[in-house]
Amino acid sequence: MNSIENLKEQSKSVFEIRNVAQIGVLGGISFILMTIEFPLWFAPGFYRLDISELPVLIGSFAMGPLAGVLIEMIKVLLYFFIHGSSTAGVGDFANFIFGCSLVVPSSILYQRHKSRKTALIGLGIGTLTMTVASALLNAYLLLPVYSVAFHMPMAALIQMGTAVNPAINGLWAFVLLAVVPFNLFKGILISCLTMLLYKSVSPILHNRIRH
């Protein structure tokens, strides 16, 4: 019951003026990080890695899961309105879902008992949740949308995966050998950075929130 009450209290405090400002700043930082991206050697070139979830995770650890969702939303909306979308917003919506699937489970578990152990468990569960969500959405939504948006048959997209890994010979091989490793790598990287940076950044965030 205490953990539920804590989450309710955090949800109320999120909309205090100082917290709203803090969420806005973290959303802006996340947007900037989202524009800095690079490919990974084991995935096709149109999958590019960024660490924009790092400020989202840090904010959600400090202020709770609702704050994390709002930071993620600000990041995605800024990117959509400034850079536009070649997929009519579908890719941006999926990015929001992926981010929330990492951030929400991680922060909920961390808020239940704030310790290094629960942070690690939460980040592990969040990484797995994001990976599963990404695998399903890529298979049933994103890859078909990319095929239409880029005027490429699905076979051509899969062939881009085959060029990187000859074992990729179909849709689910693409998902299991490219999408899943990509998201596991991303989740582990961002989790490690969060563990390294949160204790240093946390006092600043909490001072701004509480004082």
Give short role names for the model-derived ranges.
Residues 1-211:
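Loop-helix junctions at membrane interfaces
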